[in-house]
């Protein structure tokens, strides 16, 4: 990845709220299935905004920090996804998204961020991200002191 896109907590909450507005009315949804781990925080934010209490997870491992590797399904929510929102933080190459579509063909699949290769696989997203850009999510960072350039 040549570029980095840094996401703050404030930005994430604003984007999640925008996505939640598009998912109204909330009564049409039985629940949310969050893709672990990237979709856990967006899933919680959507659940809050939409007043949804039924939240489940599907646990798919496909990243090791900034390296993609073979996909492994660790745990899945039951059913075909009918009436459920499946949420992940981003769709990148589409590997995870294809697995989600196979597992939950009737779900409404959403992400906060979408890269071009995976964009056609989601039903909705908020922000376009170039394919060669790595997204630094707020849960992967911490605030630290940065000394002034002058050293004074």
From Swiss-Prot:
Enzyme Commission numbers on file: 2.4.2.-, 2.4.2.22
Subcellular location(s) of the protein: Cell inner membrane
Protein's name in the database: Xanthine-guanine phosphoribosyltransferase
Entry-linked CDD domains: PRTases_typeI (cd06223)
Keyword Magnesium appears in the UniProt entry: yes
Species of origin: Pectobacterium atrosepticum (strain SCRI 1043 / ATCC BAA-672)
Chain positions recorded as guanine binding sites: 92, 135
Bilayer topology annotation: Peripheral membrane protein
Summary of the function given for this chain in its UniProt record: Purine salvage pathway enzyme that catalyzes the transfer of the ribosyl-5-phosphate group from 5-phospho-alpha-D-ribose 1-diphosphate (PRPP) to the N9 position of the 6-oxopurines guanine and xanthine to form the corresponding ribonucleotides GMP (guanosine 5'-monophosphate) and XMP (xanthosine 5'-monophosphate), with the release of PPi. To a lesser extent, also acts on hypoxanthine.
Residues given in the record as Mg(2+) binding sites: 89
Swiss-Prot/TrEMBL cofactor(s): Mg(2+)
Primary localization class, coarse: membrane
Protein residues bound to GMP: 69, 92-96, 134-135
Record family assignment: Belongs to the purine/pyrimidine phosphoribosyltransferase family. XGPT subfamily.
Keyword NAD tagged: no
């Amino acid at each position: 990845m040549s570029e980095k896109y840094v996401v703050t907590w404030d930005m994430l909450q604003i984007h999640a709220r925008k996505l939640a507005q598009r998912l109204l009315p909330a009564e049409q949804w039985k629940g949310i299935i969050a893709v672990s781990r990237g979709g856990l925080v967006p899933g919680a934010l959507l659940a809050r905004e939409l007043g949804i209490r039924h939240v489940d997870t599907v646990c798919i491992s496909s990243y090791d920090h900034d390296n993609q590797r073979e996909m492994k399904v660790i745990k899945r929510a039951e059913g075909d996804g009918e009436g459920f929102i499946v949420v992940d933080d981003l769709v990148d190459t589409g590997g995870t998204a294809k697995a989600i579509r196979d597992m939950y063909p009737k779900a409404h699949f959403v992400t906060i961020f979408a890269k071009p290769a995976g964009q056609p696989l989601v039903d909705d997203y908020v922000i376009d991200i170039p394919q060669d850009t790595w997204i630094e999510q707020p849960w992967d960072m911490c605030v630290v002191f940065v000394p002034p350039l002058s050293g004074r």
